[in-house]
């Protein structure tokens, strides 16, 4: 009986550890300026299936993203953010999308 209980507890703990191991948090730079940028950038990141949280800091221009490695990857997050007009370290937004951003959201684009 003790062996069965111990087996169930061990399986539960291993399952929990496996779920925790699948979550990963990464930071990367996203260009933007204001609170409106923050909302749009975070919403774009959160639209990616598997992203659990996204927090962009307008002072540092860094976003912290927690995601499930079994459902997505960072490239998909970069692409989603670039599609709404914001350049990231890996992907540049299309000029026509960037040009549609409100004036307060336009930033000096890196070459």
Identify the meaning behind each predicted range.
Residues 1-25:
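Bacterial Sec-dependent N-terminal signal peptides
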Residues 23-31, 98:
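Immediate flanking context of iron-sulfur cluster ligation sites
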Residues 29-64:
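N-terminal targeting signals for Sec/Tat export/insertion, comprising classic cleavable signal peptides
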Residues 41-43, 76-84:
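Short amphipathic alpha-helices in soluble, non-transmembrane regions
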Residues 58-66, 96-102:
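Surface-exposed aromatic
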Residues 68-74:
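Helix N-cap motif at beta-to-alpha junctions
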Residues 85-97:
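Conserved short beta-strand edge segments in small beta-sheet-based binding/regulatory domains
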Residues 99-111:
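Short, low-order "capping/linker" segments at domain edges
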